[in-house]
Curated annotation (Swiss-Prot):
It comes from Microcystis aeruginosa (strain NIES-843 / IAM M-2473). Its cofactor is FMNH2. Signal peptide: none annotated. InterPro entries: Chorismate_synth, Chorismate_synth_AroC_sf, Chorismate_synthase_CS. GO terms for molecular function: chorismate synthase activity; FMN binding. Belongs to the chorismate synthase family. One of its GO terms (biological process) is chorismate biosynthetic process. Homotetramer. This is Chorismate synthase. This reaction introduces a second double bond into the aromatic ring system.
Length: 366
């Protein structure tokens, strides 16, 4: 249970960190969409381990194989299956964790729930599960781009106490990809990289915040009450490994303002469209997109698996210590950027199909 996301654009991920491979089955993708392995690979390469000195040194090519659902470079409308094979698992590094629980990791809770767990690499709780999401997200991005020219860009906003000043309305993908930490502010990025280098040498970890903007999102996506667009975005982001917080628009900072200070006042633009003079709502009002840029932030905790010795317990209830071995990210933020983008794309694509199914058909009634 809990391995499927979405209502009409449905993705089901599978696989474990040290198993034969990981992947995704996508159901509900419209037919005749032009898509290639190379397009999907672009985002997978941004997510893969071993890409720089500030991420896990595990070496995986993460080459995707499209198993079904695509023919002659176009989607068939049938389920799309994508597989990425694991090649560089070193399960012996985890032998100690077969008995000892890693503090703040999923080891103890998986054991409590199922009575059994795959301790090699964390199994399903590993961030390798997100390979399937990123692959599906690449297809969702293509749909959104093809229909409404929607552009989704994520970037590292903050690491520990180093926060970058970034304009989400103008930031570009080239700026994000200009350095290994994926912070488009070069001066702050250099400080972030130096901090991660030091944390890695200390055998410790740090967290931070990924901000993500979706531009050109049409009005009308999202549904009242339980399926509000921001509610589904929050679910998507909070389902990512290591995520601990979600904000949209003004977020928690908005609680310091009065209503007159916080409200986004309306005006009519040169095209006769209703617009807002500010965007503290983050592009969503009443759970429905208003046509402004959707701006969200996701907080990620410090990586739980660290080389520093910490107190823990064994499966049999004995107190002990653990200094984790294995290859792990000292900071998940650089590789979390494409994961956040993917979840944004999956939510928007699913709601776009729902909007088309419910609201555009009514045009035929009049």
């Amino acid at each position: 249970m809990g391995n499927t996301f979405g209502r009409l654009f449905r993705v089901s991920t599978f696989g474990e960190s040290h198993g034969g491979g990981v992947g995704v089955v996508i159901d509900g993708c419209p037919p005749r969409l032009e898509i290639s392995q190379e397009e999907i690979q672009i985002d997978l390469d941004r997510r893969k381990p071993g890409q720089s000195r500030i991420v896990t040194p595990r070496r995986e090519n993460d080459i995707c194989e499209i198993i079904s659902g695509v023919f002659d470079g176009k989607t068939l409308g049938t389920p799309i299956a994508i597989l990425v094979r694991n090649q560089d698992a070193r399960s012996q590094d985890y032998n100690e964790m077969a008995e000892k629980f890693r503090p703040s990791h999923a080891d103890a809770t998986y054991e409590a729930k199922y009575g059994i767990r795959n301790w090699k690499g964390g199994g399903r709780s590993s961030a390798r599960e997100t390979i399937g999401r990123v692959a599906a997200g690449a297809i969702a991005k293509k749909i959104l781009k093809s229909v409404y020219n929607v552009e989704i860009i994520g970037y590292v906003k903050r690491i520990k106490d180093l926060e970058a000043i970034i304009d989400p309305n103008t930031v570009t993908l080239d700026e994000v990809e200009s350095n290994i930490v994926r912070c488009p502010n070069g001066e702050t990025a250099a400080k972030m990289i130096a901090l991660i280098d030091q944390i890695r040498l200390d055998k410790d970890s740090i967290g931070g915040v990924v901000e993500c903007v979706a531009r050109n999102v049409p009005k009308g996506l999202g549904e009242p009450v339980f399926d509000k667009l921001e509610a589904d975005l929050a679910k998507g982001m909070m389902s990512l490994p290591a995520s601990k917080g979600f904000e949209i628009g003004s977020g928690f900072a908005g609680t310091f303002l009065t209503g007159s200070e916080h409200n986004d006042e309306y005006f009519i633009d040169n095209n006769g469209e209703i617009r807002t003079t500010s965007n503290r709502s983050g592009g969503i009002q009443g759970g429905i997109s208003n046509g402004e840029n959707i701006i969200i932030r996701t907080a990620f905790k410090p990586t739980a698996t660290i080389g520093k010795e910490q107190k823990t317990v064994t499966r049999s209830g004995e107190e002990t210590t653990l200094a984790a071995k294995g290859r792990h990210d000292p900071c998940v933020l650089p590789r979390a950027v494409p994961m956040v983008e993917a979840m944004m794309a999956l939510v928007l694509c699913d709601h776009l199909l729902r909007f088309q199914g419910q609201c555009t058909i009514s045009d035929r009634f009049f």
